[in-house]
Amino acid sequence: MTANVTKLEDNKVRLDVEVPPEAVREGVEAKLRELRKQVRVPGFRPGKAPRRVLETHLGRDYIYMEALQESLPAWYSRAVIDADIRPIDRPEIHFDDPLDEKKGFRFSATVEVRPEARLGEYKGLEVPKREVEVTEEQVEERLEELRGQFATLAAVEDRPVREGDFVILDFKGERMAGGELPGAEAEDYMLEVGRGELLEDFEKNLVGMKAGERKQFAVTFPMDYREESLRGQSVLFRVHVKEIKERDLPPLDDEFAKEASEFETLEELRAAIREQLEEAARRRAEGEFRARVLEAVAERAEVEVPEVMVEDKAEEMVRSFERSVSAQGIKPEDYYRIAGTGREEFKRQVRDDAADTVKKELVLDAVVAAEGIEADEEAVRHEIEHLAEDSGRSPEEVEKSLRENGTYALLREELARQKALDFLVEHARAVPMPPEDEQMPGSGEEPGGGEGVVEARVESAAETEAERDEEGESR
């Protein structure tokens, strides 16, 4: 099979493809074998009707049309690989002549391809990097958090509720305008007052109440409340505080260190906490630096981001989010309902991030091309083994599946991008961060990839390819 490429305007190319006679015959024979099993021909057992009888029974044109519909996607995919192009949308297929088992078959495919970013300066850039510093206050805060995990709850009888207390209460709410309020009722509910688990005004009304006291008060739901039907609604709550409890914190001493950790003394525990905080701070600073390096390179590059790529990326981000929500046992449609939004609205919200991500991916692709970067075979094997472990299949099965659905190339592409980002970071010059930026929280996000991101993108791309194949078959 041969495929010639002609560049067109607007990032499009035309593939002129010639399918040899033997490939056409293979496609027709494959379809005939399938039809023999499906079609009942009087006088013949299923699967035994000869070709001439099937042609008489169904018509040669029908058989050729079915064979073409079955074979064309594979021929197009083969041509894309042979021509070394990277389509980003569905092709427009055109042909003049029908299948011919003696002459072969010719068709053209016009398709939009991935644009190439024009890199500006990308090596030796000066990029601010945050200094890693852990204060004594941070160590003490972490120590207090650990101390809180070993606290016990002691009953309070000689004072009313105050912030930080735990209360056990019954409550029931009903609309001030009349009518029940589903879900606004509980018995023996334990609440940490002031933590923000329930409405702020609800928790504030508990402060000052005593054990055994009953009270009713009105609360108005804020206009940005997650449940749209409750926004701005006034609700009357009847509350019965049954018990008040307060934290009884253990003393900070060597005995606590032994109970809470593998260390013998409090000072050893403090040192370990500092080391953990410093390591976490280093990771955040490195992640932020990598993001800043990529941002600096992207700012100096020129690239037009196609709308179809933004749409695909936004869909990928939504699907990744929905997988994450589902993994927590929450149905995506339930999440959208509770959050007062919908899937399409959520997709609109992530479009700017999607466009930014696509631009940076195109920039990394340009670095890959400029520096001749390739994915490491060891890294490819590692990702395939990781995917196999998650799916309960063998690495060989996973690799075969990735190659068949066209996402093996995507895996290598994503790993090459990560390697390109490593290259950019290695060739950047870290400079002290300006004081005004030091006050901003750092980002530990791995730009362009990271643990789990490759797998998510491969899965999402496989789903998208499957949907496109289905749509192609239906046309």
UniProtKB/Swiss-Prot annotation:
Primary residence = cytoplasm
Q: Which GO terms describe its cellular component?
A: cytoplasm
Give the residue ranges for region: Disordered. 428-475
Signal peptide range in chain numbering: none
Q: What class of enzyme is it?
A: isomerase
| Acidic residues bias: start-end ranges | 462-475
Give compartment(s): Cytoplasm
A Gene Ontology molecular function term of the record: peptidyl-prolyl cis-trans isomerase activity
Task: Spell out the InterPro entries in the cross-references.
Answer: PPIase_dom_sf, PPIase_FKBP_dom, Trig_fac, Trigger_fac_C, Trigger_fac_C_sf, Trigger_fac_ribosome-bd_bac, Trigger_fac_ribosome-bd_sf, Trigger_fact/SurA_dom_sf
So what EC number does this one have?
5.2.1.8
Catalytic activity from the UniProt record: [protein]-peptidylproline (omega=180) = [protein]-peptidylproline (omega=0)
Q: What is known of its domains?
A: Consists of 3 domains; the N-terminus binds the ribosome, the middle domain has PPIase activity, while the C-terminus has intrinsic chaperone activity on its own.
Instruction: Identify its protein family.
Output: Belongs to the FKBP-type PPIase family. Tig subfamily.
Q: Please state what the protein is called.
A: Trigger factor
List the source organism: Rubrobacter xylanophilus (strain DSM 9941 / JCM 11954 / NBRC 16129 / PRD-1)
Gene this chain is encoded by: tig
